[in-house]
């Protein structure tokens, strides 16, 4: 995200979710237009889910990482609104080159290895 910001004239809004207290946000501040925070405890920012902080229609593109249930909800919302979405998938990876098939995930294009083919995929490929 930070590399894209440096290379293109774009505005980045960072939406982050934490259990109780935020961290490392000052490292992102120089590169983003706005930082939105949600915490489970309500200690900082919005009390609730990070997905509550955004209306995807206000964005041209959404990039997400985190719990799969959150990414799925966000990606499906983006798909429904016609907003480009990228998801960063996580799996336990044994070999890192796709040989062991330990990180295989079923996609719209068949089984793909997260380590070799990803880890970032278009939301439509994973959650369509």
Sequence positions of predicted segments:
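Short amphipathic alpha-helical patches
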Residues: 51, 98-102, 127
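FNR/FR-type flavoprotein reductase catalytic core
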Residues: 1-90
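Short microdomains enriched in Cys/His and/or Lys/Arg
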Residues: 117-128
